Amino acid sequence: MRRTVPRLVMLALAVGVLAAPALAQDKAKGAVITLQKGGEIRIEFFPADAPKTVENFVKLAGQGFYDGQFFHRVEPGFVVQAGDPQSKTLAPGDRRVGTGGPGYSIKAEFNKQKHERGVIAMARSQDPDSAGSQFYITLAAAPFLDGKYTVFGKVVSGMDVVEGIKVGDRIASIKLVN
């Protein structure tokens, strides 16, 4: 019995330490995207409108999936886009960048959120259920996208940073915030 109690305490502590990151991810209300060139973009999630999409983004960000990727698409007055893991190894301008993903796709969660300036949404191909890891942030309102792409959050600070993004600008990290 004397040996059992300390072992149970150690086991409980180990489980708590290992479970803490998962619990923190479950409670993430947003994220901070830090660029290598400097600047931060603070995002607030819409879990009530796109629960599986938020869950997927949180999982990928928590794994460091986006760290080191670059923004591969910049359309002035429209969007900036990132999330292709190939951008970690391929050069900006390589035609393959923009075609990659995490190796799976998630079901679309079209919702009532409008494509206003500063929303974050999932990029996809022609198939509505083809989104995986690529996301975009709108630089201006884009109502023609409403109901066609999954909006899962919005920029709450750092739009000046978003507006300064150029093709090739790298993500240093995406940290989850509660």
Task: Enumerate the language-model features and the residues they cover.
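Small-residue packing motifs within transmembrane alpha-helices
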Residues: 8-12
